[in-house]
């Protein structure tokens, strides 16, 4: 199994074994750090049913909230890409933007922070603030939600 050091992961959970953190590693504070957020499994690459691996779903704040990577109706028919080229997706097969948080809620998504609180974050949030909420140890504090 692949492993990563805790210092290599900016979020609360990591992709590989050993990459998760404990509360003491959340130096920006648990009320300033996203732990979980909404994802739309059909809106990412890696697998037609979502960005999924044996260990779970991967998502982050690298892409803007609700960035359109959803291969819906006009793009996909069963397991086939629409050959007409009328797809409205933005890089649904890109490692940089595909694993972003996204929701079917209008205007944003629900997030659980490391302190257990739940917040609706607007998709119009300042992108730098959004990224700050996604990093547990950057010493950059986001504006209050």
Predicted regions located by residue number:
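Surface-exposed loop/linker segments characteristic of extracytoplasmic
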Residues: 1-145
């Amino acid at each position: 199994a692949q492993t990563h050091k805790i210092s290599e992961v900016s979020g609360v959970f990591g992709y590989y074994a050993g990459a998760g953190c404990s509360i003491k590693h959340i130096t920006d504070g648990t009320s300033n750090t996203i732990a979980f957020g909404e994802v739309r499994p059909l809106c990412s690459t890696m697998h037609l049913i979502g960005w999924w691996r044996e260990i779970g779903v991967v998502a982050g704040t690298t892409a803007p909230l609700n960035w359109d990577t959803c291969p819906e109706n006009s793009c996909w028919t069963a397991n086939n890409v629409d050959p007409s080229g009328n797809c409205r997706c933005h890089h649904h097969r890109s490692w940089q933007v595909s694993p972003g948080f996204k929701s079917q809620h209008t205007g944003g998504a629900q997030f659980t922070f490391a302190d257990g609180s739940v917040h609706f974050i607007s998709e119009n949030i300042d992108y730098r603030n959004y990224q700050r909420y996604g990093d547990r140890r950057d010493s950059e504090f986001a504006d209050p939600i």
